[in-house]
Swiss-Prot record:
Protein name in the entry: Large ribosomal subunit protein uL6
SUPFAM superfamilies, alphabetized: Ribosomal protein L6
UniProt keyword annotation of rRNA-binding present: yes
A Pfam family per the record: Ribosomal_L6
GO function terms (MF aspect): rRNA binding; structural constituent of ribosome
Entry-linked NCBIfam families: L6_bact
Organism: Chlamydia caviae (strain ATCC VR-813 / DSM 19441 / 03DC25 / GPIC)
A GO BP annotation: cytoplasmic translation
């Protein structure tokens, strides 16, 4: 049994969970999310608490699936209640970002501007031209879009230029040592 899944998921005020046709639906103040349940998992709802158990017929991989679905449901509850946010910072001369409609426009030191379509479920905002904020209720979608932005220009280890998560530590390397010595 998964250690996390031993504890119930406590539902905050304003969040409702229902199960229909092997799908779990979580509704809250920020929206609603759906997830198809695996046959190895049984979900019970009692007194504003959600319990995730392994199905009685499963012998092969109950613990893994139980922990996975506990985490997925927990993230869905947190997403519809408070939401998720990833912040990225751009470091480099001339690096800037702008949101134009449903497109994120990045100037990241290449000969052409990089345009990225923003998924409809996310809100992207730019502060100070170099700080990008990605918000949404789906943790996976927020993380994937933030990672795709970062992948356009990952931070390099010599000067640290690039796009990084806020407060991300970038391990720096020493450059080439200057030539010294007599001829």
């Amino acid at each position: 049994m998964s250690r996390k899944a031993r504890d119930p998921i406590v539902l905050p005020q304003g969040v409702e969970v229902s199960i229909q046709n092997n799908e779990i639906l979580v509704k809250g103040p920020k929206g609603s999310l759906k997830q198809v349940l695996a046959p190895e998992v049984v979900v019970d709802i009692k007194d504003r608490e959600v319990f995730v158990h392994a199905a009685p017929h499963v012998v092969d991989r109950p613990s893994r699936m139980q922990g996975l679905f506990w985490a997925l449901i927990s993230n869905m509850v947190q997403g519809v209640n408070t939401g998720f946010e990833k912040r990225l910072e751009m470091i480099g001369v001339g690096f800037r970002a702008a949101v134009q409609g449903s497109v994120l426009d990045l100037s990241i030191g290449v000969s052409h501007p990089t345009k990225m379509p923003i998924p409809a479920e996310l809100q992207v905002s730019v502060e100070k031209n170099t700080l990008i904020s990605v918000k949404g209720i789906n943790k996976q979608l927020v993380g994937e879009f933030a990672a795709s932005i970062r992948a356009k220009r990952r931070p390099e280890p010599y000067k640290g230029k690039g796009i990084r998560y806020e407060n991300e530590y970038v391990r720096r390397k020493a450059g080439k040592a200057a030539k010294t010595g007599k001829k």
